[in-house]
Amino acid sequence: MLSLIYYVLATIICFVLYLLSWIAYFLTLPFDKRRVVVHFLSKLITDTVLGIFGRHVVGAENIDRKQAYVIVINHVSMMDIMSIYPLPLVFKWVSKREVYKIPMVGRLLYMHGDIVINRASTKEAMQLVHTRGMEWLKKGASVSIFPEGTRSKDGEIHNFKAGAFILAKDAEVPILPVVVEGTDNMTRGRFFMNWKNRITIKVLPPVSKQDVVERPIKEVMTDVRQQMVDALAELRANKKK
């Protein structure tokens, strides 16, 4: 019963905020170059959907609010996109084309200016991420990317693709590693909510612009992945205590 009430109330609130997002989008588009207002309304939507699970941010002190980053995040659930909105940054997502077909979600991503890619064409996708990513980074907005390229089926962090790291190097911006834990355990079965579940977002120290520019991409990519693997293991160990 509680799950049903949650779904109904969350749907109503999200729909109202969705309508407000359209209004804000048209009113602020001429002067809001980073689409901060729409981003804030999306944060309210994610607070409605995920706030009940007690999202906890660890390592927020590693973020410079005035800096644009390439954010790299592990990917285990569709909720990963919603999970990091507590971070004090305006960011644009790189997301597969199929997500844009989801009612409301696709339109919201469009209003954000998120980067939609066709994973069937790797070369085209990489070019689009690079071009649009550079545009947003120059405007001062961060770009969020799942470096594994797809959702992990076993919850572990697998090999990274180089796209996010090439973008950061060419744009000369720091890389901000973020590890999310708990988004894959929000429900019991297909419908009932797991009310005891908690979501933790751990922000790791960024890779400096100097390191991104001067060090080999493969080396940076390997180091960042290992840091994220270690951080995820630590979060899981702490959760069992």
Protein language model regions, located:
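Membrane-interfacial terminal anchoring regions of lipid-handling membrane enzymes
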Residues: M1-L27, V36, E61-I63, K218-K241
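Catalytic core of membrane glycerolipid acyltransferases/transacylases, capturing the structured
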Residues: Y18-H39, I52, R65-T122
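Short gly/ser/thr-rich secondary-structure transition/capping motifs
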Residues: G51-V58, M126-Q127, T183-N185
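Hydrophobic beta-strand scaffold residues
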Residues: H56-V57, V116, V143, I175
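Generic preference for hydrophobic
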Residues: G59, I71, W93-V94, I201-V203
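A short beta-turn/loop motif at secondary-structure boundaries
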Residues: E61-R65, M193-N194
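Non-catalytic C-terminal accessory region of glycerolipid acyltransferases
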Residues: Q127-K241
